[in-house]
């Protein structure tokens, strides 16, 4: 068959990788929502969801059916186009951010030379979804939550990007595969410990997870910028949040903990185990820490995280220049 060229085979293999990896990411995000409720019940000495299926194993299926059949209601005075577009942008931007993550040698959807810049671009695109949702809902709580979320996300994305510059300087590349290969002897978490701490804090803030969930604070804003959403539109926001957790956890593993590298076990297993550990940390943080005031969150970012990232970057640059002499 002369029409089957090597280029076509390469394109088909890339599409297959994309479908497999993205389906796994969506599935992990969905199962994390169930696992979080079970673990929070364990941490708080109460029962989690345990009524549907054996030990609550079918709770996720029940939630999906319930959400699918809920009324897809749009407020009367909202901007219908932007209101509908917002959850789609939120879901796809967070999903596309995972495309640059190499889960094992040769298994990456988009092996870009500007991989880290692509991730930061997708993280910035998610801000538009929040602003669109808050403004188009024509609800004061929704708008206030969107303003909080956009200010918080844009602030912490500064620290998110600066915390990665030390890793980029050490690896000499923005390519994620090159960064993983540069950690063959020493993981970046050792020389870039303060960069990792800042990236972890900023990652939690960008995902709007507890204790940085002020944009969705139920006690203050009645669920924030997606208060008017229901049905599958709310489902896209809901699953998108957990996909963001999976993506940030995978990036922590890739950038600071050697990616797929490890002894004995296959590379994909090492990557999955490391990522699952950091996903567990997200849940443990939610169960352990109180929610600070919004002004405290912003003050912490600009007065502590920013100086820490700048000091880390200056020290990294000084060490690289000293080694080059």
From Swiss-Prot:
NCBIfam families: PRK06076.1-1, PRK06076.1-2. NDH-1 shuttles electrons from NADH, via FMN and iron-sulfur (Fe-S) centers, to quinones in the respiratory chain. The immediate electron acceptor for the enzyme in this species is believed to be ubiquinone. Couples the redox reaction to proton translocation (for every two electrons transferred, four hydrogen ions are translocated across the cytoplasmic membrane), and thus conserves the redox energy in a proton gradient. This subunit may bind ubiquinone. Disulfide bonds: none annotated. Keywords: Cell inner membrane, Cell membrane, Membrane, NAD, Quinone, Translocase, Transmembrane, Transmembrane helix, Ubiquinone. This is NADH-quinone oxidoreductase subunit H. It catalyses: a quinone + NADH + 5 H(+)(in) = a quinol + NAD(+) + 4 H(+)(out). GO terms for biological process: aerobic respiration; proton transmembrane transport; respiratory electron transport chain. It comes from Escherichia coli (strain K12). It is found in: Cell inner membrane.
């Amino acid at each position: 068959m002369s029409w089957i060229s090597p280029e076509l085979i390469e394109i088909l293999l890339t599409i297959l990788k994309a479908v497999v990896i993205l389906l796994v990411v969506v599935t992990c995000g969905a199962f994390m929502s169930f696992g979080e409720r079970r673990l929070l019940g364990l941490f708080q000495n109460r029962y989690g969801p345990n009524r549907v299926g054996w030990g609550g194993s079918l709770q996720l299926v029940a939630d999906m059916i319930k959400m699918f059949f809920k009324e897809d209601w749009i407020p009367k005075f909202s901007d219908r186009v932007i209101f509908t577009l917002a959850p789609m942008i939120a879901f796809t931007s967070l999903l596309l951010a995972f495309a640059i993550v190499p889960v094992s040698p040769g298994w990456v959807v988009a092996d870009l030379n500007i991989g880290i810049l692509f991730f930061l671009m997708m993280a910035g695109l998610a801000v538009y979804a929040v602003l669109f949702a808050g403004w188009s809902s024509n609800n004061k709580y929704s708008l206030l939550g969107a303003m909080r979320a956009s200010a918080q996300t844009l602030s912490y994305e500064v620290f998110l990007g600066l915390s990665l510059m030390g890793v980029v300087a050490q690896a000499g590349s923005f390519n994620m595969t090159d960064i993983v290969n540069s950690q063959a002897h020493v993981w970046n978490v050792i020389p870039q410990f303060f960069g990792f701490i800042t990236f972890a804090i900023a990652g939690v803030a960008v995902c709007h997870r507890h204790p940085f969930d002020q944009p969705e604070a139920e006690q203050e804003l009645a669920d924030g910028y997606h208060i008017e959403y229901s049905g599958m539109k709310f489902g896209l926001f809901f699953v998108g949040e957990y996909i963001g957790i999976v993506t940030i956890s995978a990036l922590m593993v890739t950038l600071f903990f050697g990616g797929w590298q490890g002894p004995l076990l296959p590379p994909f297993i090492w990557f999955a185990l490391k990522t699952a550990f950091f996903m567990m940390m997200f849940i443990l943080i939610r169960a352990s820490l109180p929610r600070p005031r919004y002004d405290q969150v912003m003050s912490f970012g600009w007065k502590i995280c920013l100086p820490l990232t700048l000091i880390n970057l200056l020290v990294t640059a000084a060490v690289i220049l000293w080694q080059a002499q």
